[in-house]
A protein has these predicted regions:
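A glycine-rich beta-to-alpha transition motif near the start of alpha/beta enzyme domains, typified by
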Residues: 1-168, 180-353
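Glycine-rich ThDP/TPP pyrophosphate-binding loop and its adjacent helix/strand module
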Residues: 173
Length: 353
């Protein structure tokens, strides 16, 4: 056996993810910060990302977190994030809810009812997490995300196929272009998801070409990494319906924690959302995040995002010595064209090996 890892699979309002919590050698990742560990992981273990997220172990919407020992005082657990896209600057997209559900319901960390409070350490920095627990289950997870901020508001952006679209730029754990679905002529419903996906990819490409982003606290974060598309809610009890989409075409079925944080930063900058005011946003499938701004500073906010997660399976993933696809594979029937194109050379190299 070449590789064996233990994992918990879970979904957050329909968004699938995997928490990898055991595997020989995978805790020995060098770095004095989780950001450095993520960088090392990308440079030396990117084959593992491909193995876990591509077929036959993954599918286009798959993502994963790898639990690692924390680096900062006060952190209960650290993790790096594996997404479908591979970039030279760095993914910091948090996936905290499924991490906490996996940690507590698996018994890795002790659960205290009715409330358990933890500090998790993703690459973007420490985040406080509060879990409402009952009967040995995590019922609701609230996360105080990283400081979030808008850097541009309603800038006219020429998007091929969609004309001039007002776009804002905001950080919520990733840098996003934030746009209104009505300006794109799309509707956030499952049967039109492909249209939303293609429009969001076009927005991200246009924003990368024309709009600048620089994170004031990390010079390695200097590119717009995705698109948040916002629409009116279907349920009048909510304030918005939204999704976040990456350049690879990976799109959230949940409202997206990082995307919601960026959207809240835009609303705050416009004067449309105040500290302490509730903000409820729904995803493609109707799942709701309950949010509010818990504090503000010089141009930034700390958003609190509340949502639910469910465990869907417990797994031991293996790679046998003679597996002809040691990094997995993709095909053009269900995978985005860009992903298939970048994977072709990798597959050829695997076969040569």
């Amino acid at each position: 056996m070449k590789l064996a890892v233990e994992a918990v699979d879970a979904h957050v309002e329909g968004q699938h993810g995997r928490v990898i919590h055991g595997g020989e050698g995978f805790l020995d990742v060098p770095g004095t910060t989780m950001f450095e560990k993520m960088t090392w992981f990308e440079q030396h273990l990117d084959w593992f990302r491909r193995l876990m997220l591509r077929e036959p172990r993954g599918y286009p919407r798959s993502c994963a977190n790898v639990l690692l020992p924390p680096t900062q005082p006060g952190s209960d657990a650290g993790f790096v994030i594996l997404e479908q896209h591979r970039r030279d600057d760095h993914r910091v997209r948090p996936r905290h809810r499924r991490v906490q559900v996996g940690l507590l319901e698996e018994g890795t960390l002790p659960m205290t009812e009715p409330v358990t409070e933890l500090t998790l350490e993703p690459p973007a920095g420490q985040v406080g997490v509060r879990a409402e627990c009952a009967g040995g289950r995590v019922r609701l997870v609230e996360i105080d995300n990283v400081p979030s901020f808008a850097t541009a508001l309603d800038v006219p952006l020429e998007v091929p196929g969609h004309g001039t679209v007002p776009a804002s730029v905001a950080w919520g754990g990733m840098a996003f272009a934030v746009v209104d679905a009505r300006d794109l002529g799309v509707e956030l419903v499952p049967e039109r998801a492909r249209e939303v996906q293609q429009a969001a990819i076009a927005v991200c490409a246009a924003a990368r070409a024309r709009l600048a982003f620089e994170h004031p606290g990390n010079e390695g974060l200097h590119e717009i990494e995705g698109t948040v598309v916002i629409a009116p809610p279907h349920d009048p009890a909510n304030h918005a319906r939204q999704t976040a989409c990456l350049p690879s075409g990976q799109m959230d079925t949940s409202p997206s924690g990082t995307g919601t944080s960026a959207a809240m930063a835009v609303r705050f900058a416009r004067g449309e959302l105040a500290v302490g005011e509730e903000f409820r946003t729904e995803g493609f499938l109707g799942g709701v995040f309950r949010c509010r701004i818990v504090s503000e500073g010089d141009g930034w906010i700390v958003p609190r995002i509340g949502g639910r997660a469910w465990i869907t399976g417990y797994a031991r993933y293996v790679l046998q010595d003679d597996d002809p696809f040691p990094e997995g594979f993709v095909m053009g029937d269900i995978w985005p064209a860009a992903t298939v194109g970048t994977a072709a050379a990798s597959l050829a190299a695997q076969r040569r090996g």
